[in-house]
Amino acid sequence: MTTEAKCPFLHPAGAGRALQEWWPERLNLHILRQNAPLSDPMGEAFDYAKAFNSLDLAAVKKDLEALMTDSQSWWPADFGHYGPLFVRMAWHAAGTYRIGDGRGGAGAGQQRFAPTNSWPDNVSLDKARRLIWPIKQKYGRKISWADLIVLTGNVALESMGFKTFGFGGGREDVYEPDESVYWGNEAEWLADKRYSGNRNLENPLAAVQMGLIYVNPEGPNGNPDPVAAAIDIRETFRRMAMNDEETVALIAGGHAFGKTHGAGPASHVGPEPEAAGLEEQGLGWRSSFGTGKGGDAIGSGLEVIWTTTPTKWSNDFFKHLFEYEWELTKSPAGAHQWKPKGNAGAGTVPDPADPSKRRSPSMLTTDLSLRFDSIYGKISRRYYDHPDELADAFARAWFKLTHRDMGPRARYLGPEVPKEELLWQDPIPPVDHPLIDAKDVAALKAKVQASGLTVPQLVSTAWASASTFRGSDKRGGANGARIRLAPQKDWDVNQPAELAKVLVKLESIQSEFNKAQSGGKKVSMADLIVLAGCAGVEQAAKSAGQDVTVPFSPGRMDTTQEKTDLDAMVVLEPIADGFRNYLQGKFSVRAEALLVDKAQLLKLTVPEMTALVGGLRVLGANFGNSQHGVFTKRPGTLTNDFFVNLLDMGTEWKPVSEEREVFEGSDRATGTPRWTGTRVDLVFGSNSELRAVAEVYGAADAQEKFVQDFVAAWSKVMNLDRFDLK
């Protein structure tokens, strides 16, 4: 017998063909199991906010500032200063954020993991993170990688003479890649199958090619056309929550520092970190060109230095952009870039590795877009003529870039949090009055239940308010009661006419209650909407024979229309909400996958998602009072009927059309129609994992457990944005 045959462990656990490879259309429920407590080495008891607040932030910044000019032989600093490298590190960590689903960004330290740690656009950032490891090691649990990466970018800017807008900590690390993020379906780096028609970029993507943070710096698909590149820039930055002025400020401000790297052909560069050998210890892109570092470094393939002072804040970027005329050239690696005509500016720019050498300024195709695009050009000229405006705009845009995915200001930690309230932070006033107590809660529930509002109305309104929350960028939720305001009050999914009726009655209850109070006690509409939903759930459970008390914590406040950014709020509108059996139109993605996507944004587990769908169906919370999935003869009553009837083998299901979006369930023996259901409904009987959970709730002894689990999941969603309770 051979040695190989004798060995009982020829293949490790988990090896072999993955289930998704056998069945590519299989519903991916893994994204509802990410970051489980068992995978977190810090343990459930760890309080990061408390740890961060005990940190001597000034000491950390002092250590970071010392690091800026402490060049290491294994990865020497360009121009003797690591500042530009660290600015790029923070920028590229935050720059993965996109408004479409709120995913990406710097909020969890994802740059440490695949795929972004190995994107072509992130070459050498593995070294940047390794350079700050001694500081992370020194301060340990008191500062997360996520916070340290952003803070390092801030200190880098400050060490180069730039005044930043501020810094808020509070980004808690995770310890695994975020597999919920759709980065595109391309199978090769820098491919761009994400476009259709006349360069229509697939939602929710922002970057133009697989493995890029933003746009191709050489121009669209490498075509060095600054005007065409401006179209890509505008669309990409818009999808990252930046307007034209912020976009110009970010590009110009960022390119006031440092350089790009293209000393030689990319053929000299080794595999990225995720593909590199064990001996590389998590580093990648080892280069065989010259020394492979310093002046010989290869990154993007472009070899551009924008200013005469690449480690000092200046307005040189715009000075060069406008004062020189530019002609196309190529980098040593063969990439398209631009140089001043007639060798203007020769000898005015320092060499990154040899102080005795001088170079000429250069520009990227996308830099020239800021001059030759008609809109960007006017903004750029104004910033050139008014450098103080540029400094303020860049400081604010940088703060927005690095904090956009952190949610409300209430989550910011530390002594450098700006006092100014910014519209993009979705501001909500602080509590300024005594809150309602248990006696008030009971009285208000009684008022709600006597108001004539139905269980479906109460439940649907509370769900519509709370379920806008996105765990990705911590936006949305019931706090603020923005469901009363544009644009939420007019969203199709919220059934505006029906919503208005509910809000009028709740506002009447609120007004009557508040007028009757002394000492300034009030109930906000934000609290009352949630409380009314809880009352509806309790009423529905009582109708099923169970007395339950749905947990309720007052403390939400009402915001105003003036404090609501209409453009920023639009992206929260659901195009699909499987919990309400709502689809805005036809999509290439299956409805059940959109349900799982929504559940992940709501931070739900598989059982929580299952309980909520089953409960909301029998409570009549469907959009447009649709009967799809209402598998009960007792609507408005909180029963496990959805699961009992879905799992009934006496029902035979058939699609009602070739689109296979809606199905009819008929008596298997007589053919008499019983129910109709959507893909979202039937997946709980079709998918093996979801069926296993549905069978728990469909059992003869499951009614009490189902109600308990539904109430727990409901309460979780109602409180997702209550960061003050966590």
UniProtKB/Swiss-Prot annotation:
Gene3D superfamilies: 1.10.520.10, Peroxidase, domain 2. Disulfide bonds: none annotated. GO terms for molecular function: catalase activity; heme binding; metal ion binding. Residues 335-362 are annotated as: Disordered. There is a cross-link at Y214-M240 (Tryptophyl-tyrosyl-methioninium (Tyr-Met) (with W-91)). One of its GO terms (biological process) is hydrogen peroxide catabolic process. The record marks R88 as: Transition state stabilizer. Its EC number is 1.11.1.21. Belongs to the peroxidase family. Peroxidase/catalase subfamily. Bifunctional enzyme with both catalase and broad-spectrum peroxidase activity. Homodimer or homotetramer. This is Catalase-peroxidase. It comes from Cupriavidus metallidurans (strain ATCC 43123 / DSM 2839 / NBRC 102507 / CH34). The gene is katG.
